[in-house]
Amino acid sequence: MGKAAVEQRGVDDLVLMPKITEQDICANLEKRYFNDLIYTNIGPVLISVNPFRRIDALLTDECLHCYRGRYQHEQPPHVYALAEAAYRGVKSENINQCVIISGESGAGKTEASKLVMQYVAAVSGNSGGVDFVKHSNPLLEAFGNAKTLRNNNSSRFGKYFEIHFNRLGEPCGGRITNYLLEKSRVTFQTRGERSFHIFYQLLAGASDAEAQEMQLYAPENFNYLNQSACYTVDGIDDIKEFADTRNAINVMGMTAEEQRQVFHLVAGILHLGNVAFHDGGKGTAAVHDRTPFALKNALLFRVLNTGGAGAKKMSTYNVPQNVEQAASARDALAKTIYSRMFDWIVSKVNEALQKQGGSGDHNNNMIGVLDIFGFEIFEQNGFEQFCINYVNEKLQQYFIELTLKAEQEEYVNEGIQWTPIKYFNNKVVCELIEGKRPPGIFSLLDDICFTMHAQSDGMDGKFLQKCQGGFPSHLHFRGMNNAFSIKHYAGEVTYEAEGFCEKNKDTLFDDLIAVIQESENRLLVSWFPEDTKQLQKKRPTTAGFKLKTSCDALMEALSRCSPHYIRCIKPNDNKAYHDWDATRTKHQVQYLGLLENVRVRRAGFAYRAEFDRFLRRYKKLSPKTWGIWGEWSGAPKDGCQTLLNDLGLDTSQWQLGKSKVFIRYPETLFHLEECLDRKDYDCTLRIQKAWRHWKSRKHQLEQRKMAADLLKGKKERQRHSVNRKYEFDYINYDANYPLQDCVRSSGRDKEATAFTDQVLVLNRRGKPERRDLIVTNEAVYFAMRKKKSGQVVYNLKRRIPLGEIASLSLSTLQDNYVVIHHNQYDMVFENDKKTEIVTILMENYKMSGGRDLPVNFNDNITYKASNGAQRRLTFSKNESASAQPSIKKSRANIQIGIATGLPKETDSSPPNWTPSGGGGGYGGGRGGGGGGRGAAGGGRGGFGGGGGGGYSQPVAQAQPVAQVPQPVAAVPSAGRGGPGMGGPGAGRGGPGMGRGGPGMGGPGAGRGGPGMGGPGGPGRGGPGGPGAGRGGPGGPGAGRGGPGMGGPGGAGRGGPGAGRGGPGMGGPGAGRGGPGAGRGAAPAPAPAAPAKPQVKALYDYDAQTGDELTFKEGDTIIVHQKDPAGWWEGELNGKRGWVPANYVQDI
C-alpha cells in the first residue's frame, strides 16, 4: 500500500504503524471506519468496529471465497480470515480452536460470531451441523436476548458453541453451552429496557385461539413487563420475530405438544408475576387476591424440618413468610422456571445437532466461538452489571495471561532475547471480586445473604458496610453512600448496592419444588428432578456462587483450545452509521489494551512450537531432515536448526529456546506454510502424474493392440511404425491458443482433444496442402495456417462430426494415405501416424455413437472431391519408391507406387500383452518403442521399453527390402533409458512419435544411457518420419553417443541418437561414439565421397527442429544421405539438415 493510500485509508495492521500511541491507533481506526474498512489487525488479533449498517462488499459470496485457503497476510483483515486460520488449525494440525469475541454491549459481537459460523459452513463442505447452529439463532435470541439501553438486541446470556469435525475436516455435529443467563430480567427491568423478547413475541404473535386459551393481554397488564414502561422497539417486528421463532422450533425437532407446553409456561410466568401479597398480620404475608391459587401455601409458608436426617425423631413445621419473603419466593420460582426452560431449549438444540452430526468418524476436534454480553457501564448499575462485568474481567485476565504475561514469562524461561513490556494486570481486580482469603465481594455478599435470610430491609446497607470495612485502602475499590465503585480494566463503574442481596439469594425452597413436581405439565415436571424426600436442605447456593462456578467452567473450556481474538468496538451510542465518537472509542481502545497488545506484537515472536512438533510439521522442507525414509535421527533441536538453516531464513527471524522454536514475524510463518503447501502440491502432482502416466500407457497399449488386430493380415506395415509410441499431440496443441480459438470458433468449446498433428490433404486438384488435423471426442477438424503480417493465423476449413463419418478407407500397402468418407465430400490425407489416427477415430466413434466405425482395405479407392467429382486412388508396388511414394496424376485418377513393406501378417501387438497390463509394460516413458523419429536401432531412437519398471524387447520382424541390419535384442533397463544392447546404428529412423521420454529400453529408448553396441553400421542414420518432439537416444546411435564399449570399428559414423539424448555406449559407428573399448580402436577411414545427388522441393516446408532444413517449393537441395525410413540429409545454402523425403523429388 502506497503512502498516499495509507494517509487516506490507514494501515491494515496496527503493528505496521510507524508511530504507536493511543491517539495514532484511534486515528487509524477512524480513517478505516469512514472508508467502510471496519476490520483491522494487530497481528492475529482482529479489531472490528460496528458500522451499524450492512456493508455489502464485505459479505458477498465472492468475498468469502477470497479467504478460502489463504493466510491472514494475503487478504485484507476480516472475520473470514480469522475463521480460516481457526479452520486450518483444526484441519491441518488437529488442535482445538476457539474464537473469543469481546467488547461492549452493542459493539457487534453476535454478528461477528454469525460470520464465523457462515464461513465455516461455506468452506468445510458439509455444512449441515453448522447450518443447524445458525437456524438455532432465532430461537435462542427470542429466549435469551432483550432490549437494553445500549442495544436493541442484546445477548443476556453467554453462548459458547462448538462445531465438531471429523478426520476429513468436515463438520459432524456440535454443541452449545449457555452461561450466565440474566434471569433476574424476568422479574425486573430498568426503565427503558424490556424483558426477554419471547414475552412480547407471544403477546403480539399468538393466534386469537391461543390468546384466549392462555389469557393473554397487552404487556401493560403484566407486572413483570410494565415496570420499565417499554413495550416496543424500533426496528423489531414482534409478530414477524414470533413466526421466525416458531419456524426455528420446528427445525429443532420439537413436537407440537412440547411447543404448546413451552408457550403455556411463558404465559404462566407472566400470570405468576401478577400474584400480589399484603401483610396478613404478625409479620406474615397473605395473597391479595383470594381467588383459589394452587401455589398459595408454597408461597406463604416455608417448610422447616428439625432433628436432621440421622435423628431418631424429626419434626416438620410450616413457617409463615413475610411479604418480602413471599414476593421473593414468587420471583425465585418465575426465574427458576424460565432459566430451566432456557436450559431445556438449549438441550433440544444440542440433540438436533447430534442427529445432524450422525455417528460417523468423530475426531474430537472442534472450533468454539464465545459470544457473551459485553462490558456494561450505565448511569445506574446494579447486580446484573456487576456479574456481567465480572465475567468480562475474567475474559480480560485470560487474554492478558495468554498474550501478555504468559508470553513474556515464556521468553524468560526459554532464554529468548526480549525487551519486557509494561502492562496492566487485572488479576488484582478479579481477586477483589472473587477472592476467598481475604474474602472478596462475592464472599461478603453470600455471607450477608446467609445470616440475614429472613429479612430484606437493611441487608444491602449491611453488605455495603462489610465491603467498606473489608477494603478500606484497596486501590481499585471505593465505598460511597448506598453505592460502591470498582476500577475495572474498562474503567471505573459505580454500582448501586440496592437489590444486591435480594438478587443474589436466588432461592427456591423444597416446598416450591414439591408443588411443581405435582403439576400436570409433564414437561415442567421434567425440569425439576430434585429429590424432595431429603427435606432438610443444605444452605442454598446463591447467584454469585453459581456465576463463579460457571465462569470457572468457561475458563477451563477455553484453556483447552488455541485462542483467536476479535475485539469489538462501538463507535457511538446513537447506533448511527459513520458517526465517530472520539472520546468513546479512545476509552475502548484503552481498556481493551490495544496499545500494549501492539507493543508486545512488535517486540515479540508471532509463533512458537515445541521442537518435536515443529520438526514433525516442517521436516519435509529439507532433504536433511526428510531424507528417504522421512525421519530425523538426531536431536529434535538440532533438526530444527538444520531445517531453518537449509531454508535460508535469516537468524533475526527466529530463535531456538530450551524446548521451543520461536518465529518472530508472521510473514516467516506464512512463508513456511506456503513452502509446505508447495511441497505437498508437488508430491500430489507427482503421484497424479505417475497415475496418469500409467493410465495413459495402459491406454496406449490397448490402442496398439486394437491397431495390431485391425491391420494384421490386411495391410503391409512400415518398419518404423510397428513399435512406435503413441503421443497423441504432435503440434503442442495445449499451448497453441490461436489454434484452440480456431477450433472453438465452431461453437464447441468443451470437446476433449484426442489427437493433433499436421497432415497433407489432397485438394480437389490432387495437390497436397498442409493442414492441422485435430481429432476430438466429437469431431474431426482440419485447419489451415498461414502468415499474416508476420503472425501465424488459423482458418478452420472443415469440421466433420464423428457420427457423420460413413467409413474409412486404406490401401493394403505400406503407404500413409487415409480416406474419410462423408456424405458431402471425402477427405484424403497423408500422415505417417495413420495407424494411430485410425485407431483413435475408431475408439471415439464407438464411444460417441455406440457402434463400430467401418474400415475398408482396398488398393482401388473411389472418393468424392470437394467439387463433387468422383476420383480414384490406385495403389501399386514400385520397389524403386522405397524412400517415398511415387505419384502419377491423370484427370480423375491418382496412381501411387510404394515399395514392399513388412508382411501383412506382421504382428505389432505389444509383447507379453494382457488386457489388465500397463503397470510396467512395453513402450512407456519417453522414447519408448520407436520413440522420437528413430527406427529400430536407427539414429533417433529405436526400440525401447517404458519407464517405471517396464520390460523392453523388440518385436520380431521380417527382413525388409532395404538392407538394414536388424537390432540386437534389448535388455531391461531403468530410468531415462538405461543401458541396453543396441544394434548397429543403421540410418536415421523412420517417422516416430514426438518426444521420447525416459524408459527402459534398448536402442532408441528414452534419453538413453550408455548401451553395449554391436558392430557399427555404415553411414549416418536416416531421418525419422515427420513429427513433433524428439525421442530419447538409445543404444547404437543413441544420443550423440559418447565413447563406449564396442566391437571393432565400422566404416563411417553411426546414426545420431533419438532426440537430443545424452551420451550412450555405442558400438563403432553408433551415435558419435568412438569404436572399441573405452574410446575403442580407431574407426576405419571413410570412403571417398561420391557425387552428391540433388532433389527439387515440391512443397514449402518449415523446420520443426533445429537440425531440419526449411525450404520453399522449387528449391534445389543437395542430398548427402538417403534413408528408406523417409528422412534425407540435405544441404541448402550451405546449411545441412534433415528433410522429409515426401516433400522432394529427384532431379
Curated annotation (Swiss-Prot):
All copies of domain Myosin motor, residue ranges: 9-677
Modified residues (Phosphoserine): S315
This protein's GO CC annotations: cell leading edge; cytoplasm; myosin complex; plasma membrane; plasma membrane bounded cell projection
Subunit description: Myosin I heavy chain is single-headed. Dimer of a heavy and a light chain. Inability to self-assemble into filaments.
Residues reported in the UniProt entry to bind ATP: G103, E104, S105, G106, A107, G108, K109, T110
Ranges for domain SH3: 1090-1147
PROSITE patterns noted in UniProt: MYOSIN_MOTOR (PS51456), SH3 (PS50002), TH1 (PS51757)
Keyword ATP-binding: yes
Record carries keyword Phosphoprotein: yes
Protein name, per record: Myosin heavy chain IB
Biased composition (Gly residues): 916-951, 975-1079
Domain commentary: Myosin tail domain binds directly to anionic phospholipid membranes; myosins I could therefore move actin relative to membranes and vice versa. TH.2 and SH3 bind tightly to F-actin; this together with the nucleotide-sensitive site in the head, allows single molecules of myosin I to cross-link actin filaments.
Residue ranges, annotated region (Actin-binding): 551-573
Domain TH1: 715-900
Reported function: Myosin is a protein that binds to F-actin and has ATPase activity that is activated by F-actin.
Organism domain of life: Eukaryota
Similarity comment text for this entry: Belongs to the TRAFAC class myosin-kinesin ATPase superfamily. Myosin family.
The organism of origin for this protein: Acanthamoeba castellanii (Amoeba)
Gene3D superfamilies in the cross-refs: 1.10.10.820, 1.20.5.4820, 1.20.58.530, Kinesin motor domain, Myosin VI head, motor domain, U50 subdomain, SH3 Domains
Miscellaneous notes: This organism expresses at least three isoforms of myosin I heavy-chain, encoded by genes MIA, MIB, and MIC.
Keywords per UniProt: Actin-binding, ATP-binding, Motor protein, Myosin, Nucleotide-binding, Phosphoprotein, SH3 domain
Region (Disordered): 901-954, 969-1089
CDD domains attached to this UniProt entry: MYSc_Myo1, SH3
InterPro entries for this protein: Kinesin_motor_dom_sf, Myosin_head_motor_dom-like, Myosin_TH1, MYSc_Myo1, P-loop_NTPase, SH3-like_dom_sf, SH3_domain
GO biological process: actin filament organization; cellular component assembly; chemotaxis to cAMP; endocytosis
